[in-house]
UniProtKB/Swiss-Prot annotation:
Entry function: Transferrins are iron binding transport proteins which can bind two Fe(3+) ions in association with the binding of an anion, usually bicarbonate. Lactoferricin binds to the bacterial surface and is crucial for the bactericidal functions. Has some antiviral activity against papillomavirus infection. N-terminal region shows strong antifungal activity against C.albicans. Contains two BBXB heparin-binding consensus sequences that appear to form the predominate functional GAG-binding site.
Keyword Cell membrane: no
Lineage: Eukaryota, Metazoa, Chordata, Craniata, Vertebrata
Transferrin-like domain span: 24-351, 363-692
UniProt name for this protein: Lactotransferrin
Source organism: Mus musculus (Mouse)
Gene3D superfamilies found in the cross-reference section: Periplasmic binding protein-like II
Signal peptide span: 1-19
C-alpha cells in the first residue's frame, strides 16, 4: 500500500461515503489522556464529525481487556504491548498505523541495523570479543533487537540470570547508555561522557541515541554500531563518507549501507491503533481517524492538535512525532504487523538457551490440507523429529505462517513463488526433474530447466483450437498457480484485452475462485461433496492430477497443466479407478498456432516454459533449511538410503503431496537468491500484468509491510 502524499489521507471508496453514526469508544490510561480525549470528542462534535466517547482505565492492560469485552473500542499501542495484545485471549488487531517522517518520506517503521567499517572482515555470528556501540539499554534498535538476535551466541541460560552480565562478557568493551555502570562497568567502558554523564541515557553522553551509537563507531570506540538504518544517511550525507561503512546481515553476509531494507536485524513497527479482530467497528474507527487527521493533524490552524500534548506531558493518545495515519490492510494481524524478526528478537530475551538453539536447528514444514499433513507426519516420524509439521487450508495461509515464523518452509509453484517473494520470502532449493542431457549423479548441482505448461484436450473432442476456446469448459490446477492459471489466463487476457475470466469459459473448475461463480461450477469437492472448489487436495479436481481428472471425466473440454502430468497418469501408470483405463493416445495438446499435436510433442506445442517448483523460506532460515533438506533427501529422496523402506519424499498416495512426484532431487539455485531472479524477468512481467486483473488481500498486505 502506498502512502498518498501530501495529504496522508487515504480516501478509499468506503471512506468517501457517509459512515454510519457509530460511536467509537476510545480508551485512555491516565487523567491527562482522558482530558485530551474529551477535548477531541468536543472538537469532533463542533465540526460534525463521527461520534466519539472516552473511557478511562488505570492501565494499558485494563484498556486491552475493556476492548475485548466491548466496553471500549480502540487505543494506541507500541510494538511490545501489541505483541501480547495480539495473542489469545485478547486477539486484538492493528487498524491504523501511525506515520512518521515527512510528507516526502513517510514511514510506518524503521530498520534496526548493525553497522561496521568497510575494512571489517567479520560477520554477525563472529562478534564475540569485539567492541560494541548501542543506542541505549532497553531500546529496540540498540539493545532488544541486536541482543535478541545474538541470543544464541551469548553464554546466558535465560531468566533469572542477568542478561546485562552475559552481554558484558560477550563483548570486550561496550557503550550501552543507561546501563548500571557500577554493576556492569564493561557496558560503559567505551562511552565518551565525563563524570556523572558517562554512560548516561541522555544527550550529555555523546554516544547515546541513534546518532551517538554511529559516532561511537566513527570515533573507533567500537567495532560495530547497533542503530537505525536511516541514521547513516542523516549523519553521513556525503556518499564518500557513507561508503566507508557496510552492514552485517542476518545471513552472515555484508551489504552496502544503502541496502538496509534488505539487510537489517529487524523492522521495528510504528505504534498502531488496535481494536477487536471481529471487525465490528473497524470502519467507524478508520473514519474517525481519517477525519480527525484532516481537521486536527499537523500544521492545521485549529487550536486542538491531535498529535500534540500540553506542556509537561508527552505522547498522549498518540506519538507526537506522528504526522498522520495509514490504514492497515485487513489481512495484517499483529504477527504480520510486528514482523518475524522483531517478535523473535523479543521472544529470544525470554527463552532458555537450549530452547533458542533448538528452534534455530528445527525445520517446520507447512502442509496444505489434510492429505499433505498425513504425509508430513510420516516425514516427521521418519526424520526423528528433525522436520516438524503444521497444516493450513490454503497455500496463502502457509505463506503467512512462514512469514510469521509459525512455519519455516514449503515447496511452491511459480505463481506462488511470485507471491511469496513479494512477501519477503526467498527460494532455497528447486525441484529438479530428470534430464536427458545428464545422469542423476549431478542432480543437486544441475541447473533447473523448467517445465512445459500445456493445454490438454481429449482427442475425441475435436472441432476447436486455441483461438476458439471461448464458451468451452475448462479445468485448472488452481487460481494463481503457474501452468493452471497464470500462463493460460495471462495469454487469454492479452488476446481478449479483458479480465472477465468467469465469462470467457462457460464453466470451469479453478480451485480457489469464488465458489458461487462459474469458475467453480465444474468442481466436485471431496467424496462427501463438501469442500467444493477448495484450493487444496480436498477438492478432487485440484492440482495437476486433479485438472487431468476433470478433463478425463469429461467435466471440461480443456485442462491447463504441465505436459508430464498426462504422461504420468496414462497407460497404467496411475492405478486409481478414474485413471486406470486412460491411454496417452487419447489426449492431445492445443498449440498457439491453432494446431493440435500429440502429448509427446509438447516441446513443439506448449503455452510457455514455466519455472520449476521451489522450496521457499525466510532469509534467516536459508542456511539451516538447505542443510536439513539436502540431508533428508540423502535418506528419503529418490534412491535414498531409507526409501522406499521407510519413507519417500517424492512419492505420494494421491499424487504430488508436499513435492511433485516426478522430482528427482532438490537442487541448489546459486545466484538466484530472490524470487524475481529465480522466476526470470519475462515470467515476472507476465504475472504482474495478470495481477492487475484482480485484487489480492495477501499481496496488498505484503505491499504495506514492505513499503
Amino acid at each position: 500500500m502506498r502512502l498518498l502524499i501530501p495529504s496522508l489521507i487515504f480516501l478509499e471508496a468506503l471512506g468517501l461515503c457517509l459512515a454510519k453514526a457509530t460511536t467509537v469508544q476510545w480508551c485512555a490510561v491516565s487523567n491527562s489522556e482522558e482530558e485530551k480525549c474529551l477535548r477531541w470528542q468536543n472538537e469532533m462534535r463542533k465540526v460534525g464529525g463521527p461520534p466519539l466517547s472516552c473511557v478511562k482505565k488505570s492501565s494499558t492492560r485494563q484498556c486491552i481487556q475493556a476492548i475485548v469485552t466491548n466496553r471500549a473500542d480502540a487505543m494506541t499501542l507500541d510494538g511490545g504491548t501489541m505483541f501480547d495484545a495480539g495473542k489469545p485471549p485478547y486477539k486484538l488487531r492493528p487498524v491504523a498505523a501511525e506515520v512518521y517522517g515527512t510528507k516526502e518520506q513517510p514511514r510506518t517503521h524503521y530498520y534496526a541495523v548493525a553497522v561496521v567499517k568497510n575494512s571489517s572482515n567479520f560477520h554477525l555470528n563472529q562478534l564475540q570479543g569485539l567492541r560494541s556501540c548501542h543506542t541505549g539499554i532497553g531500546r529496540s534498535a540498540g539493545w532488544k533487537i541486536p541482543i535478541g538476535t545474538l541470543r544464541p551466541y551469548l553464554n546466558w541460560n535465560g531468566p533469572p540470570a542477568s542478561l546485562e552480565e552475559a552481554v558484558s562478557k560477550f563483548f570486550s568493551k561496550s557503550c550501552v547508555p543507561g546501563a548500571q555502570k557500577d554493576r556492569f562497568p564493561n557496558l560503559c567502558s567505551s562511552c565518551a561522557g565525563t563524570g556523572a554523564n558517562k554512560c548516561a541515557s541522555s544527550p550529555e553522553e555523546p554516544y547515546s541515541g541513534y546518532a551517538g551509537a554511529l559516532r561511537c563507531l566513527r570515533d573507533n570506540a567500537g567495532d560495530v554500531a547497533f542503530t537505525r538504518g536511516s541514521t547513516v544517511f542523516e549523519e553521513l550525507p556525503n556518499k564518500a563518507e557513507r561508503d566507508q561503512y557496510k552492514l552485517l546481515c542476518p545471513d552472515n553476509t555484508w551489504k552496502p549501507v544503502t541496502e538496509y531494507k534488505e539487510c537489517h536485524l529487524a523492522q521495528v513497527p510504528s505504534h498502531a491503533v488496535v481494536s477487536r479482530s471481529t471487525n465490528d467497528k473497524e470502519e467507524a474507527i478508520w473514519e474517525l481517524l481519517r477525519q480527525s487527521q484532516e481537521k486536527f493533524g499537523k500544521k492545521q490552524a485549529s487550536g486542538f492538535q491531535l498529535f500534540a500534548s500540553p506542556s509537561g506531558q508527552k505522547d498522549l493518545l498518540f506519538k507526537e512525532s506522528a504526522i498522520g495515519f495509514v490504514r492497515v490492510p485487513q489481512k495484517v494481524d499483529v504477527g504480520l504487523y510486528l514482523t518475524f524478526s522483531y517478535t523473535t528478537s523479543i521472544q529470544n530475551l525470554n527463552k532458555k538457551q537450549q530452547d533458542v538453539i533448538a528452534s534455530k536447528a528445527r525445520v517446520t514444514w507447512c502442509a496444505v490440507g489434510s492429505e499433505e499433513k498425513r504425509k508430513c507426519d510420516q516425514w516427521n516420524r521418519a526424520s526423528r523429529g528433525r522436520v516438524t509439521c503444521i497444516s493450513f487450508p490454503t497455500t496463502e495461509d502457509c505463506i503467512v505462517a512462514i512469514m510469521k515464523g509459525d512455519a519455516d518452509a514449503m515447496s511452491l509453484d511459480g505463481g506462488y513463488i511470485y507471491t511469496a517473494g513479494k512477501c519477503g520470502l526467498v527460494p532455497v532449493l528447486a525441484e529438479n526433474q530428470k534430464s536427458s542431457k545428464s545422469n542423476g549423479l549431478d542432480c543437486v548441482n544441475r541447473p533447473v530447466e523448467g517445465y512445459l505448461a500445456v493445454a490438454a484436450v481429449r482427442r475425441e473432442d475435436a472441432g476447436f483450437t486455441w483461438s476458439s476456446l471461448r464458451g468451452k469448459k475448462s479445468c485448472h490446477t488452481a487460481v494463481d498457480r503457474t501452468a493452471g492459471w497464470n500462463i493460460p489466463m495471462g495469454l487469454l487476457a492479452n488476446q481478449t484485452r479483458s479480465c472477465k475470466f468467469n465469462e470467457f469459459f462457460s464453466q470451469s473448475c479453478a480451485p480457489g475462485a469464488d465458489p458461487k461463480s462459474n469458475l467453480c461450477a465444474l468442481c466436485i469437492g471431496d467424496e462427501k461433496g463438501e469442500n467444493k472448489c477448495a484450493p487444496n487436495s480436498k477438492e478432487r479436481y485440484q492440482g495437476y492430477t486433479g485438472a487431468l481428472r476433470c478433463l478425463a471425466e469429461k467435466a471440461g473440454n480443456v485442462a491447463f497443466l504441465k505436459d508430464s502430468t498426462v504422461l504420468q497418469n496414462t497407460d497404467g501408470k496411475n492405478t486409481e479407478e478414474w485413471a486406470r483405463n486412460l491411454k496417452l493416445k487419447d489426449f492431445e495438446l492445443l498449440c498457439l498456432d491453432d494446431t493440435r499435436k500429440p502429448v509427446t510433442e509438447a516441446k513443439n506445442c506448449h503455452l510457455a516454459i514455466a519455472p520449476n517448483h521451489a522450496v521457499v523460506s525466510r532469509t534467516d532460515k536459508v542456511e539451516v533449511l538447505q542443510q536439513v533438506l539436502l540431508d533428508q533427501q540423502v535418506q528419503f529422496g529418490r534412491n535414498g538410503q531409507r526409501c522406499p523402506g521407510e519413507f519417500c519424499l517424492f512419492q505420494s498416495k494421491t499424487k504430488n503431496l508436499l513435492f511433485n512426484d516426478n522430482t528427482e532431487c532438490l537442487a541448489k539455485i546459486p545466484g538466484k537468491t530472490t524470487s524475481e531472479k529465480y522466476l526470470g524477468k519475462e515470467y515476472v512481467i507476465a504475472t504482474e500484468r495478470l495481477k492487475q486483473c484482480s485484487s489480492s488481500p495477501l499481496l496488498e498486505a505484503c505491499a504495506f509491510l514492505t513499503q
